[in-house]
């Protein structure tokens, strides 16, 4: 669940549209993070990374030494990780449009020697430092989460309204959905 931790760390910390003075930033801040281990990630979203319309930088994290004794399994995973990085970089020319891979897709390959508490801690510290430095360079406070707070405030109000059925003052979309939820017995 390392990817889930990184998602929250990056997007909750730096997913801001204004700097610390309240000025709207003229550039994108937090990247969107998602990930899966091994071939799950390859089959889930690498098609889009290789041939999609958006060029998205990505990181591949691999561990050189296997933590298990399955013969050939770890070597296959490492070969696939390296192949993905190579394919993203070089692509493959083809006259057949659906078989053309443009390449020149940015990626970073982080290789740990072994998965140990020290190497995992260093990897987490790297990500935490990256988040902090990015926030400082962008002039945002990486340590407030007002977007999360807004959702909590609205949820408190809506939980009471689900129980009471009161839709007064709500927008039409939320009021309609609240009524529908009450009709289907979710209150």
Regions found by a protein language model. Give the residues of each.
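A SIS-like phosphosugar-recognition module
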Residues: 1-187
